[in-house]
């Protein structure tokens, strides 16, 4: 399963570990993904999403119905 947020689309980034001697080795910066279930009152069902912490904050601010409407406008499957 890809490490991608279903709402924001955040993906892993690449970069370097940098030692004290300034040696650089490859590394990945992974998004802070959480699996959460939300009760959608308008549909009378639970929806399970894999979200970044930023997406959780967006849902807290705008509500799950607004976020789902935005995802459907982008034609994402839910």
UniProtKB/Swiss-Prot annotation:
Entries under PANTHER family matching the protein: 39S RIBOSOMAL PROTEIN L28, MITOCHONDRIAL, LARGE RIBOSOMAL SUBUNIT PROTEIN BL28M
Gene3D superfamilies (UniProt xref): Ribosomal protein L28/L24
Record keyword Ribosomal protein present: yes
Gene name per UniProt: rpmB
This protein's UniProt keywords: Ribonucleoprotein, Ribosomal protein
Similarity field: Belongs to the bacterial ribosomal protein bL28 family.
Originating organism: Nitrosospira multiformis (strain ATCC 25196 / NCIMB 11849 / C 71)
Listed GO biological process terms: translation
GO MF, one example: structural constituent of ribosome
NCBIfam families assigned: L28
Family matches, as InterPro entries: Ribosomal_bL28, Ribosomal_bL28/bL31-like_sf, Ribosomal_bL28_bact-type, Ribosomal_bL28_sf
GO cellular component, one term: cytosolic large ribosomal subunit
Protein name according to UniProt: Large ribosomal subunit protein bL28
């Amino acid at each position: 399963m890809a490490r991608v947020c279903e709402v924001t689309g955040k993906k892993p980034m690449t970069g370097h570990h940098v030692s004290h001697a300034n040696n650089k080795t490859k590394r990945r910066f992974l998004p802070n993904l959480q699996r959460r279930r939300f009760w959608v009152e308008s549909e009378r069902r639970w929806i399970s999403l894999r979200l970044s912490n930023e997406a959780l904050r967006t849902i807290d601010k705008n509500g799950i119905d607004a976020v789902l409407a935005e995802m459907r406008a982008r034609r994402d499957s839910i």
